[in-house]
């Protein structure tokens, strides 16, 4: 992957694949599937500046599995891969195993 470094408090997220089947075994076609709201953090910016001008580091890091809002982020294509760029505040939480 091309080296891409987000600025400020922005985060690059790769969507994780959604379910292809319902609980009853019905296969959902791609056109009817909702976009997943879960993804893996690929890269993070250095952080936002506070009122004193100091950089405040982000709470998420590359490799974290996160949940975000349905309409969060801007879709971009880097090296042919569909990714999302969003602010850290668009992330609702980190999923832990």
Swiss-Prot record:
The keyword Transferase does not apply. Signal peptide: none annotated. One of its GO terms (biological process) is chaperone cofactor-dependent protein refolding. Pfam families: Cpn10. Transmembrane segments: none annotated. The keyword Cytoplasm applies. Belongs to the GroES chaperonin family. Heptamer of 7 subunits arranged in a ring. Interacts with the chaperonin GroEL. NCBIfam families: PRK00364.1-2, PRK00364.1-5, PRK00364.2-2, PRK00364.2-4, PRK00364.2-5. HAMAP family: CH10 (MF_00580). This is Co-chaperonin GroES. It comes from Acetobacter pasteurianus (strain NBRC 105184 / IFO 3283-01).
């Amino acid at each position: 992957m091309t080296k891409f470094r987000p600025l400020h408090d922005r985060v690059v997220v790769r969507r994780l694949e959604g379910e292809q089947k319902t609980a009853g075994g019905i296969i959902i076609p791609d056109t009817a599937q909702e976009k997943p709201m879960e993804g893996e953090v690929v890269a993070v910016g250095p952080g936002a500046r506070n009122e004193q001008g100091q950089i405040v580091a982000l709470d998420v890091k590359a490799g974290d599995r996160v949940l975000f809002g349905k309409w969060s982020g801007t879709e971009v294509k880097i090296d042919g891969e569909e990714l999302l760029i969003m602010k850290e505040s668009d992330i609702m939480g980190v999923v832990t195993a």
